[in-house]
């Protein structure tokens, strides 16, 4: 008859066979095996000790009766030590049944104890067992748990006879309450338990069954000769250090008594997911802390609780009313909910509060002071607030955003005089019209008229009936940029050209292949004048006439033209003109005109749509995603006095506020123009000018500084500079000779530069040399403007701070006071340009081309400023307008 120990040994030997393919896969280190975390290490130890177990099995069959009685007595010690002190005497369990108790480790509910209550009559150890033949053989195998891991997967039907989880809690509770002298013995081993997530039963049982470690002679000690064999077992484990083992309280209690409670403890500790229930691990022995303090409310005497301070709460402002602009009504609902939850949790769950809950309740306790003194009226008012549009309709601060408000534009505008129709302009004609190597070119005086039908008529003199030349303006004509050109010994002349421009598509191969649309210009006429006002008036008249030209029938020769690169370019240019008051630089009058030019290269007939940030279509835009253009402003404006090119469908614009047009092919034309209100509160820079005339002594001084209120100047990283700045000081014709001097090549205008003053006239004529100085740029008299022109290429300067002031100073001593005119100029003229900016905040929000989604689209912005600044009349000049006396008030501080 086959005995139970023989069957177990046979199955164990098969399970630990040295085959290449193990029965169960060994999990790697850090693996995710849940039910067999320690299977790898235990199987390796069982393989190394399988031969020894067979010898023990054969010797156990010849066990004498005396040895069985001896073993029964010793097993009684084990079961007697397994029961806690003061508890009812537990019977001695059958060791074979205790072995089969390990099978319950694989159940789905490892923490539930399904074992029946212990019987009063204990069975004696009459059946020999291969795992524990005698305590003599235990010297080679200190505990049954060392080899019992080899049979835990063979039989799963035996009931559990080991101490239950409740018994273990009673043992640990008494161990926590009593001070143990042997707690320091397991300090090193317990420190390694905190670093490992898996608790190995074999390692715990080995240390618990070692009487030499705790010094208890009840069980036979492990000899030093057998200690290296256990080290080899530890080397085979996959990084599982030995955890701590609680030591018994009484010195006469054998150390093997801890093996019985440690067996189920280790089996439950091997589950990673159940680690929060770690009260069985006796951590307080290592950390010298009372673990029961976690279950008690925090005591003020032991350690004051940490209180989280609110960095946004100022206790001095507790009586301040809440801000009425807070639109979040949900904030108050959250506050009420928190107050209710905190009051309930403070009364019911105070005893169950751990350290984290204490910190959380302290962190939200700063709201209690504000809730104790509420403001019912203000809170009710805040609860009724709604989130409004950031640009509300009817806001007086933003007149353009109100479509119903009637904004009165400044009238008459400063630029109205330039756009007024005139009979003609005295101009200079460049003769001959084309360059010739054999002849020189010169300027000849003529008189020009512009007819309503778009004809330019050239007369030799004003009043003649028949022009000597006449030509018609065409849609392909463009007016060139104004420039200054040498004229005579007095100075330069303002010149412009009217060109016939054609655009052609060209391929470029350097530096990389690309397609470009180059412009070819053919000069039609070149004109010039020394009167700057006539010059600007003529330019405006020609631009108005080009825009009003009728659109002729489409040229069929260009309809079928296919472009390699289809593109459309939109140029938005703002022209600001106005008058600025003295002192605080307040804008007294202004006029903003926006011009939109189109240049397109589209194959065939194409219908285009252009959408602006018009306040009347706010919220009603319907455009495709690929047609949306990026903008840098969220402002909505109102358009005034709109004028359109002949290719625009005005009926569609009046109904939908969308510009629908058929663009001219390869021709730059003005699509539309409109007036708006200036979008800024201040100009890019402030200029204050003061003049003093005392007898024959004249002084003029200006201070220039960048304005911090201008939107572009707020961020130095995104600041847009002012380019080609001109500040013109009108000079009477009687004073011109004082600003010129003789040279080898004729008369020259004196020029003042940075850190270098300019001397005017001769000492014999005026008695002393006048001085003109600047701290930035250059200053000299220019005959084309009849003014002293202070020129600055760029503001702010690259080598100076943005808020650094710049100064112009001029001191002139006349021969007598009779040279002082009866009327002196009251304004200085300022003119400059700003790229990539907009004075009106007009923005192109969408550009769409019908049935052409792959068209390249470009939008360019620029602004041109031209305004007048009043001159302050003073008895004496001082660099500081606040009245501080300086040692030398006539000179500027050099930067």
Swiss-Prot record:
<feature type="short sequence motif" description="NPF 2">
    <location>
        <begin position="326"/>
        <end position="328"/>
    </location>
</feature>
<feature type="domain" description="MHD">
    <location>
        <begin position="565"/>
        <end position="872"/>
    </location>
</feature>
<dbReference type="GO" id="GO:0007268">
    <property type="term" value="P:chemical synaptic transmission"/>
</dbReference>
<dbReference type="InterPro" id="IPR017110">
    <property type="entry name" value="Stonin"/>
</dbReference>
<dbReference type="GO" id="GO:0005829">
    <property type="term" value="C:cytosol"/>
</dbReference>
<dbReference type="InterPro" id="IPR036168">
    <property type="entry name" value="AP2_Mu_C_sf"/>
</dbReference>
<dbReference type="InterPro" id="IPR028565">
    <property type="entry name" value="MHD"/>
</dbReference>
<dbReference type="GO" id="GO:0008021">
    <property type="term" value="C:synaptic vesicle"/>
</dbReference>
<keyword id="KW-0771">Synaptosome</keyword>
<feature type="short sequence motif" description="NPF 1">
    <location>
        <begin position="310"/>
        <end position="312"/>
    </location>
</feature>
<feature type="compositionally biased region" description="Pro residues">
    <location>
        <begin position="241"/>
        <end position="251"/>
    </location>
</feature>
<keyword id="KW-0963">Cytoplasm</keyword>
<dbReference type="InterPro" id="IPR022699">
    <property type="entry name" value="Stonin2_N"/>
</dbReference>
<dbReference type="GO" id="GO:0043005">
    <property type="term" value="C:neuron projection"/>
</dbReference>
<feature type="compositionally biased region" description="Polar residues">
    <location>
        <begin position="145"/>
        <end position="193"/>
    </location>
</feature>
<protein>
    <recommendedName>
        <fullName>Stonin-2</fullName>
    </recommendedName>
</protein>
<dbReference type="GO" id="GO:0048488">
    <property type="term" value="P:synaptic vesicle endocytosis"/>
</dbReference>
<dbReference type="GO" id="GO:0016020">
    <property type="term" value="C:membrane"/>
</dbReference>
<keyword id="KW-0254">Endocytosis</keyword>
<feature type="region of interest" description="Disordered">
    <location>
        <begin position="15"/>
        <end position="119"/>
    </location>
</feature>
<feature type="domain" description="SHD">
    <location>
        <begin position="424"/>
        <end position="557"/>
    </location>
</feature>
<keyword id="KW-0832">Ubl conjugation</keyword>
<feature type="modified residue" description="Phosphoserine">
    <location>
        <position position="278"/>
    </location>
</feature>
<feature type="region of interest" description="Disordered">
    <location>
        <begin position="234"/>
        <end position="280"/>
    </location>
</feature>
<comment type="function">
    <text>Adapter protein involved in endocytic machinery. Involved in the synaptic vesicle recycling. May facilitate clathrin-coated vesicle uncoating.</text>
</comment>
<keyword id="KW-0472">Membrane</keyword>
<dbReference type="GO" id="GO:0030100">
    <property type="term" value="P:regulation of endocytosis"/>
</dbReference>
<feature type="modified residue" description="Phosphoserine">
    <location>
        <position position="759"/>
    </location>
</feature>
<dbReference type="GO" id="GO:0030136">
    <property type="term" value="C:clathrin-coated vesicle"/>
</dbReference>
<dbReference type="GO" id="GO:0002244">
    <property type="term" value="P:hematopoietic progenitor cell differentiation"/>
</dbReference>
<dbReference type="Pfam" id="PF12016">
    <property type="entry name" value="Stonin2_N"/>
</dbReference>
<feature type="compositionally biased region" description="Basic and acidic residues">
    <location>
        <begin position="64"/>
        <end position="73"/>
    </location>
</feature>
<feature type="modified residue" description="Phosphoserine">
    <location>
        <position position="299"/>
    </location>
</feature>
<feature type="region of interest" description="Disordered">
    <location>
        <begin position="145"/>
        <end position="222"/>
    </location>
</feature>
<keyword id="KW-0597">Phosphoprotein</keyword>
<dbReference type="InterPro" id="IPR012320">
    <property type="entry name" value="SHD_dom"/>
</dbReference>
<dbReference type="InterPro" id="IPR050431">
    <property type="entry name" value="Adaptor_comp_med_subunit"/>
</dbReference>
<comment type="similarity">
    <text>Belongs to the Stoned B family.</text>
</comment>
<dbReference type="InterPro" id="IPR031228">
    <property type="entry name" value="STON2_MHD"/>
</dbReference>
<keyword id="KW-0770">Synapse</keyword>
<feature type="region of interest" description="Disordered">
    <location>
        <begin position="386"/>
        <end position="421"/>
    </location>
</feature>
<dbReference type="GO" id="GO:0005730">
    <property type="term" value="C:nucleolus"/>
</dbReference>
